[in-house]
A protein has these predicted regions:
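Short histidine-centered loop motifs in beta-beta connectors
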Residues: 185-200, 228-235
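Short beta-strand-turn/beta-hairpin segments enriched in glycine/proline and small hydrophobics
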Residues: 176-191, 206-226, 247-250
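Short inter-helical turns and helix N-cap capping residues of alpha-solenoid HEAT/ARM repeat scaffolds
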Residues: 82-83, 118-119, 150-151, 181-182, ...
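Residue-level detector of extended alpha-helical repeat arrays and alpha-solenoid scaffolds
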Residues: 86-87, 123, 155-156, 255, ...
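A structural signal for short beta-strand/turn segments enriched in small hydrophobics and glycine
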Residues: 198-207, 236-245
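Alpha-solenoid repeat junctions
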Residues: 94-101, 130-135, 162, 166, ...
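N-terminal intrinsically disordered, acidic low-complexity segments at the extreme N-terminus
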Residues: 2-34
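Amphipathic alpha-helical scaffolding segments comprising HEAT/armadillo-like alpha-solenoid repeats
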Residues: 38-39, 64-78, 100-116, 134-148, ...
Length: 308
């Protein structure tokens, strides 16, 4: 009986050798393919997968601001202050109805109440929304309070909304948008920061950490979107309460909105602050340069028509 080649015998039993002898030297011998066993997903795994997908969808669905809300939903969401996104969703839905001129819009007392809420997100959204009904005196009075809010983002929204009321009370705040915002600290200690000048910032971006004498750490976050203009307190330096740490340039959208507002309520003495944006010495955006040019022309034209 002829045996298999020695190369196939080393360390292998005869039955394994017989299975592996099909090769180029023995084309008449077929290699037996191993049986493939398919694993079937068990019922519990499928159920868990379905629940995961459904849960993710429901989370998205109930937090997606594009979803229409009924009157009952809006009333419920406005008082659900444990879930800020629900409150904001309701406010957005009200804004959309106001923008469409829907005469059935209600909830004005709730909106004014949110304008006095300690949560910044509620105040800034309420300030923005109230500009969509310039006939409401209760909104007007609420905005006059919000334009003095401690948070700059709330003041800015209120100032822009007041323009719709043809009220120039927010003019100083609109001019402030054109200038770098100074970030100060209420804490004393050593600064630690890795941000570089020119870094893009979102509202809430961590600007620095301050290690106090008692070793506790205080975080300093950006109150506004924009770009880091100048670092005053460098990493490793010590600061005291009220000291300037850095300055922030406003983002393009804020600049554009401020310039649009000043086109309506700006004064001739505001022109020198606007012209650098028109000639491109401050920013290179064509959008900003164009709007700044239009704003200067609007202010000058209004001054000529109404000389003092």
């Amino acid at each position: 009986m002829r045996s298999a080649p020695d190369a196939h015998r080393r360390g292998r039993p005869d039955d394994e050798v017989n299975r592996m002898t099909g090769n180029g030297n023995n084309p008449e011998v077929k290699i037996a393919a191993p049986e493939v066993k398919r694993l079937r997903a068990s019922g519990p795994i499928l159920i868990l997968a379905v629940l995961f997908v459904v849960g993710a969808f429901l989370t998205w669905y109930f937090t997606w601001f594009g979803r229409d809300l009924s009157d009952a939903d809006i009333s419920q969401y406005l008082v659900d202050q444990k879930h800020p996104r629900r409150v904001q969703h309701a406010l957005l839905q009200i804004q959309q109805r106001l923008a469409r001129g829907d005469p059935t819009v209600k909830w004005y007392p709730q909106i004014v109440g949110l304008a006095n809420h300690p949560e910044t997100e509620f105040r800034l959204t309420a300030a923005w929304l109230m500009g969509f009904d310039s006939n409401s005196e209760e909104f007007h009075q609420a905005l006059l309070n919000l334009v003095r809010d401690p948070e700059p983002i709330v003041r800015r929204n209120a100032a822009l909304a007041l323009v719709r009321f043809n009220d120039p009370s927010g003019r100083p705040e609109l001019l402030a948008i054109l200038n770098p915002y100074v970030v100060t600290t209420a804490a004393e200690g050593e600064v630690a920061s890795t941000l570089k000048e020119g870094s893009a910032l979102a509202r809430g971006t961590l600007l620095a950490r301050i290690t106090q004498p008692d070793k506790k750490t205080v975080e300093v976050r950006s109150p506004l979107p924009g770009k880091l203009d100048r670092v005053v307190a460098t990493s490793g330096s010590r600061v005291a309460p009220g000291v300037a740490m850095m300055t922030i340039n406003s983002d393009e959208d804020s600049l554009w909105e401020a310039l649009r507002g000043l086109a309506l309520i700006g004064e001739p003495q505001d022109v020198p602050a606007i012209e650098p944006f028109a000639n491109g010495t401050v920013v290179e955006s064509d959008r900003i340069k164009q709007q700044a040019t239009l704003t200067v022309k609007a202010i000058q034209s209004r001054a000529q028509q109404n000389p003092t």
